[in-house]
Regions:
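N-terminal periplasmic "start-of-domain" segments of outer-membrane beta-barrel proteins
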Residues: 35-66, 94, 102-105, 112
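Outer-membrane beta-barrel signature, preferentially recognizing the C-terminal barrel domain
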Residues: 308-326, 506-519, 563, 592-654, ...
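Gram-negative outer-membrane beta-barrel transporters
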Residues: 651-654, 665, 671-770, 816
Length: 848
């Protein structure tokens, strides 16, 4: 209902503007829409825009998005060079750009920065359907008229402008999916787009999309401090091992409205609106077996026996809703030689997780005397651990022996709002030393407020008289692991049990609110030489932020902090033309990434040392410096009819990287701490990389009429250095895949348009398991470094154009059924193994 109200409000607004339109006889020539028909044409359109840009940018244009089997924005951008994607439930979620993780990149919608529904700065992109977008532009170099935020780069999503329409547009799309694991075909996805220039001076485009998708997935994993080594050098399981089963329905709904009004030949106004909602309705079962008391004589390179095994059967049910909404109003006009643009934006993101229960039941086998064992674990296949229970552990197979261990009701509400005003001025009639020059200058003010309110209620004591047998234990019927020991409490019955604990008392221990204001000024000149274009200038941003929270959740113990800092960033982008087809690029620019909100927020548990005005404990660090990067780019580009080749090299020198650390005898936020577990700027990092891109229409070179190929790869190397009391430690740069590659082979002729797309990403350091401990002063335990294994996927798209208006489409995703694998330090030490299966999609499209 609320989305219907939104729609009616927007359509009413559209009608109001239309009815108030000027009746002047002045007419403006319409801008013809660039129509890209077929996969090959749309790829060439993106390359043409890339060639014309004065920056290093990769572009996915219009219909090219629909020609990949990519449901979300994250999966679409993974096709570009320098981009890798972190997956969740088999779908792309966070984008890593040139080794920079999601929180170190800027994400914008039609020029307005997009806030993050989660607690940090990284924007999850698996909830943004590609049907709402017209193009995606990934900027790898920045100019002074762009925000400095994002040491990796800037990802810009754009919706279609009504002024680009030459005639009315009406499109329908309907798809359904089949997944190997869910076995369900009830996965509808439909979208609708309508747009028109209703008069010579007013046009509007409306888009709507909805998808409901059933997902079944399985994984097995081991926890932190997972593997030990015996005296013979054999590894053995030193912690818990668990199998997980996920059954969820993922629903996406979104709409866009774009309106353009040309008031006069040199004055126009526009309005952009985007709303996107993402709902996860999830049931998760966890079958966990904690190994203790290893029989040392039984340890081999692939197995070990244990005399104590604790079994936990955990069931979780939650409904999580995320929303992103952007509202933009702007315009442009001219006063003589001065061109003026303004933009006002209001962006909002929210994550609501207030329907969440987690229940755990426990049983145990323990041999206190004698030689009996509870069971033997085997890791001959490091990706699948297997357990054989001994007769002494028969209770672990009996649901009636499982008693209540934990019952938690979690809740959370994260809200993030950013308001911004942007003013840009431009004069094209300048000359400097007889060289034409465009002078630009501007100002931007933005204010951002983010709050985090999370907590939980422990109901274990109240539920303790009941055991699992009281909650109708059952075994999931789509359990695909080689081993099945699982029986679990009915999640619906557990979900109903939470009602006796509501309403919940507010838990303030994790509450914080941060306000951030940024004032930015820039000056930029574009020089147009006979054989070169040079864009040079400087941007300065001043940041002021304040944050507050409660020490250990005590409403009477408020912690307030504030801080101001500035950053000045010169930049230069040069494009030099060797001939009509060949150009060279070079650029230098500075950028920053502000600390994460959770890293600076006063999520605190601190206490005074016996009236000494000295404190100890744990807290965020409001004194953190932002990441700062100096960036260099050089590239060679060749564009010919039906053939494109580019090669580039980039380098990033990064200061003030942020990691967890325990500090001693330091003042943080005006408070002196004898010991504080917090975050700190530690050491420096650097990244060096090469990017190669190739596009060829094969019928120009081979007797392969209608065939084409596209290939890109990024080879990079990066590291982070830490100076500690035990010396200097060097590790790979976090989230950086040293090798990324995409290969597309396609056929586009007549009524058939098909493409096979291959995506490869090498392994990368996921995170340090030591985080939150004395990471830098006690040194690294390299066995606790988690890596994400390499990933290779095959996707197939085939479209048949039945008529000018009607087409049919088939998509196959993850056709090789490639799993996601994570390991501790070496690939034979399991951390996590996920399987999602392949997905097939069938659909119809109608346009008028």
């Amino acid at each position: 209902m609320k989305n219907l109200i939104r729609l009616l409000t927007l359509l009413t607004y559209s009608f109001f503007i239309h009815s108030q339109e000027s009746t002047s006889d002045d007419t403006v020539d319409s801008v013809e829409e660039i129509v890209t028909v077929g996969t090959r044409a749309s790829l060439k359109s993106g390359l043409d825009k890339q060639k014309e840009s004065n920056q290093v940018v990769s572009i996915i244009d219009s219909d090219a998005i629909g020609d990949f089997p990519d449901e979300t924005a994250a999966e679409a951008v993974r096709r570009l060079s320098g981009v890798s994607v972190e997956n969740d439930q088999g779908e792309g979620r966070y984008v890593t750009l040139r080794g920079m993780a999601g929180g170190l990149n800027a994400v914008a919608m039609n020029g307005a920065l997009v806030p993050a529904p989660e607690g940090g700065r990284k924007v999850l992109l698996d909830g943004l359907p590609t049907e709402l977008l017209d193009s995606i532009e990934v900027y790898k170099t920045l100019t002074p008229n762009q925000d400095l935020e994002g040491i990796g780069g800037r990802i810009e999503f754009k919706t279609k402008k009504a002024t680009e329409l030459d005639e009315a547009v009406l499109k329908f799309r309907y798809d359904t999916q089949y997944n190997e694991f869910s076995k369900s075909t009830d996965n509808p996805k439909y979208s609708f787009t309508y747009g028109d220039k209703f008069t010579e001076s007013f046009g509007a485009i409306f888009g709507y999309t909805f998808q409901s998708k059933h997902i079944i997935s399985n994984n097995n994993e081991v926890g932190y401090e997972p593997w030990d080594i015996d005296s013979n050098g054999n590894k053995y399981l030193g912690r818990d091992w668990e199998m997980r089963f996920y059954d969820l329905t993922r629903q996406r709904e979104g709409m866009t409205l774009d309106m353009d009004f040309e008031y006069s030949p040199n004055t126009s106004f526009f309005m952009n609106y985007l709303f996107n909602e993402y709902v996860d309705d999830e049931v998760r079962h966890k079958d966990e077996y904690r190994a203790r008391d290893v029989v040392e004589s039984s340890i081999t390179s692939t197995s070990a026996a244990y005399q104590r095994i604790t079994a936990d059967k955990e069931s979780k049910k939650r409904i999580e809703t995320r929303q992103i909404e952007t509202q933009i109003i702007g315009g442009e006009t001219s006063f003589g030689d001065l061109f003026f643009k303004f933009q006002v934006s209001n962006s909002f993101a929210e994550e609501a997780d207030d329907n969440n229960i987690d229940a755990k039941f426990r049983s145990e086998c323990r041999i206190r005397e004698g030689d009996d064992i509870c069971g033997t674990y085997s890791w001959a296949n490091p990706q699948f651990i297997n357990i054989v229970l001994a007769p002494a552990a028969s209770d672990l197979l009996d649901p009636s022996t499982y008693e209540w261990d934990e019952f938690e009701i979690d809740y959370g509400l994260i809200q993030d709002r950013e308001k911004a005003l942007k003013l840009d001025f431009e004069n094209e009639n300048f000359e400097l030393f007889d060289t034409p020059m465009i002078l630009q200058f501007g100002y931007k003010f933005s204010t951002r407020t983010k709050s985090n309110n999370k907590g939980n209620l422990d109901g274990s004591d109240a539920m303790s008289p009941l055991g699992m047998i009281s909650y109708s234990p059952y075994t999931p019927d789509k359990w695909y692991f080689p081993q099945n020991l699982g029986f679990f409490a009915d999640p619906d019955l557990l979900f109903d049990a939470q009602s006796q604990f509501r309403p919940l008392e507010r838990d303030l221990s994790k509450f914080w609110e941060t306000e951030e204001e940024i004032n930015a000024f820039y000056l930029m000149s574009t020089f147009d030489y006979a054989n070169a274009v040079v864009v040079a200038g400087v941007r300065h941003e001043n940041t002021s932020f304040k944050t507050f929270g409660y020490n250990d959740g005590n409403i009477n113990d408020v912690l307030n902090f504030n801080r101001d800092y500035g950053f000045t960033a010169p930049s230069i982008n040069i494009k030099y033309f060797l001939d009509d087809n060949t150009q060279l690029r070079g650029s230098f620019y500075r950028s920053l990434s502000r600390p994460g909100f959770g890293e600076t927020a006063p999520i605190a548990d601190i206490s005074e040392n016996e009236g000494s005005n000295q404190f100890r404990g744990s807290m965020g660090n409001p004194d953190l410096e932002p990441y700062e990067a100096d960036n260099l780019d050089f590239s060679y580009e060749y564009y010919d009819d039906g053939f494109v080749f580019t090669a580039g090299v980039f380098y990033k020198d990064i200061e003030n990287t942020i990691y967890p650390r325990i500090l001693a005898n330091q003042t943080i936020g005006g408070i002196f701490f004898t010991e504080l577990e917090t975050y700190a700027n530690a050491g420096s990092s650097s990244i060096l990389g090469i990017e190669l891109n190739l596009f060829a229409e094969l019928d120009n070179y081979l007797p392969l009429d209608g065939f084409f190929a596209a290939f890109n790869t990024t080879l990079s190397d990066g590291e982070s250095n830490f100076d500690t009391g035990l010396g200097t430690f060097t590790i790979p740069f976090r989230k950086l895949s040293e090798e990324n590659a995409n290969l597309s082979l396609g056929y586009d002729k007549g009524k058939i348009d098909a493409r096979l797309a291959v995506n490869y990403r090498s392994s990368y350091l996921d995170y340090l398991g030591d985080e939150g401990e004395d990471l830098l002063d006690s040194g690294f335990n390299y066995g606790f470094i988690r890596f994400t294994d390499d990933y290779l996927s095959y996707d197939l798209t085939a479209k048949y154009q039945y008529s000018d208006n009607l087409s049919f489409k088939f998509e196959g995703k993850n056709l090789g059924n490639r799993p996601e694998y994570y390991y501790w330090n070496t690939s034979d030490r399991l951390s996590q193994y996920d399987e999602y299966g392949y997905t097939l999609s069938f659909g119809v499209r109608y346009s008028y």
